C-alpha cells in the first residue's frame, strides 16, 4: 500500500501523507467541507461557494447552514468563470472556506484556481477546497495554494466507489468517520489495496497521455461545433475555452429531456444536467451563465473522450439531423 500511495503522490506532485483514500468524490467533498469548517469554529462560520457545484458540495453546504454557517455564492460571469471582483467583495475576516470546482461538470468551464488562491493569500484563516472531479486528465491541475482537492478516479477510467482527497500536510480537519486511523487520522477504515492500485494505474495513464488525448478530443469538439452551428436553433452553452470533453448546447424551443429521449431511441447517450441533479429542474450551470430559464431547460450535454472516433461523430450528426427535423421544425 505504501508503494502505491507513493506512486499516486508522485504523479500529483504531493506528499504521500497528503493522500486520503475515500469512497468517491462525494465523500471527499463532504470530508473536506465539513472537516475544514468544523475545525475552524474558533475563526468563523462564513463560507463562499458557487451555483456551479456538484450536489455533494451543495448538500454539505446545506448541512453546514443548519449548523449555523453562513453561505454566500459568488457571481458567475457570462463566460462561466467566477467573478473575481465579487469574490474579493464577499471575503471577510470570518471567512473560513472557499469551495470551487476546477472544471464545471455541465459546461466544462475551467475556473481560475491559481488566481483564486492568490486572492486568498491575504486571508490566512480561509481554506481553499477544489473539486477536481472533472479536471484530471482534461486540464492542468493547480495545487499551489489549494488546501484540499477532491479526485474521482471513475472520471478517468478508474473504478467506481474509489476516491481521493488531497489534503495539505499541516491542515487539521475534523474526521467524519471515526475509528482506527490505519492510514490517516482523518478517515478511519482500511482502504483496499486493489482499489488503490487501480487509482494509481488510471491516474498514470491519464496524466502520461494527457496532451495526446486532449488534442484528439479537441479536434472532435471543433468538428461537432462546426457542424452543429449550421442549425439555426442550436445554441452553444459551453464557452470556447472549456475543456473539449464537454459540449453543452440547447436547441431553442425543445426541452433537453425530449432530445435526450429521441437520441436515446437511436442508441445515443447524452446527459441533461449533471448526473446527481434533481430531475425536471433547469440546469443550474446553464442558467447561471445564460440567465435564461427556457434555455437552461433546453440544454443537454455531449461527452467526448480519447476513445471517441470520427466515425462515431459522423454517425451522431446523422442521427442528430433526423431528431432535429422531427423535434425542432
Language model regions located:
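Pyridoxal 5′-phosphate
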Residues: 1-329
Amino acid at each position: 500500500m505504501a508503494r502505491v500511495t507513493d506512486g499516486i503522490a508522485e504523479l500529483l506532485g504531493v506528499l504521500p501523507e497528503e493522500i486520503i483514500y475515500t469512497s468517491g468524490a462525494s465523500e471527499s467533498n463532504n470530508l473536506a467541507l465539513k472537516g475544514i469548517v468544523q475545525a475552524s469554529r474558533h475563526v468563523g462560520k462564513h463560507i463562499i461557494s458557487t451555483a456551479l457545484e456538484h450536489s455533494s458540495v451543495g448538500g454539505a453546504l446545506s448541512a453546514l447552514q443548519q449548523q449555523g454557517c453562513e453561505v454566500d455564492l459568488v457571481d458567475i460571469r457570462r463566460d462561466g468563470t467566477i467573478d473575481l471582483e465579487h469574490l474579493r467583495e464577499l471575503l471577510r475576516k470570518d471567512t473560513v472556506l472557499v469551495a470551487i470546482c476546477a472544471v464545471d461538470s455541465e459546461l466544462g468551464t475551467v475556473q481560475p484556481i491559481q488566481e483564486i488562491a492568490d486572492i486568498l493569500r491575504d486571508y490566512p484563516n480561509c481554506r481553499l477546497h477544489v473539486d477536481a472531479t472533472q479536471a484530471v486528465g482534461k486540464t492542468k491541475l493547480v495545487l499551489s495554494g489549494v488546501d484540499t482537492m477532491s479526485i474521482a478516479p471513475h472520471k478517468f477510467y478508474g473504478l467506481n466507489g474509489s476516491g481521493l482527497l488531497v489534503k495539505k500536510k499541516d491542515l487539521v480537519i475534523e474526521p467524519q468517520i471515526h475509528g482506527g486511523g490505519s492510514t490517516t487520522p482523518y478517515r478511519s477504515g482500511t482502504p483496499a489495496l486493489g482499489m488503490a492500485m487501480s487509482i494509481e494505474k488510471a491516474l498514470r495513464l491519464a496524466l502520461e497521455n494527457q496532451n495526446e488525448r486532449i488534442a484528439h478530443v479537441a479536434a472532435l469538439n471543433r468538428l461537432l461545433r462546426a457542424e452543429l452551428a449550421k442549425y439555426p436553433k442550436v445554441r452553444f452553452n459551453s464557452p470556447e475555452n472549456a475543456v473539449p470533453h464537454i459540449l453543452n448546447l440547447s436547441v431553442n424551443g425543445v426541452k433537453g429531456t425530449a432530445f435526450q429521449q429521441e437520441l436515446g431511441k437511436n442508441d445515443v447517450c447524452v446527459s441533461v444536467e449533471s448526473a446527481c441533479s434533481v430531475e425536471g429542474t433547469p440546469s443550474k450551470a446553464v442558467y447561471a451563465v445564460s440567465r435564461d430559464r427556457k434555455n437552461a431547460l433546453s440544454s443537454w450535454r455531449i461527452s467526448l473522450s480519447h476513445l471517441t472516433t470520427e466515425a462515431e461523430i459522423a454517425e451522431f450528426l446523422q442521427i442528430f439531423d433526423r431528431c432535429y427535423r422531427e423535434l425542432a421544425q
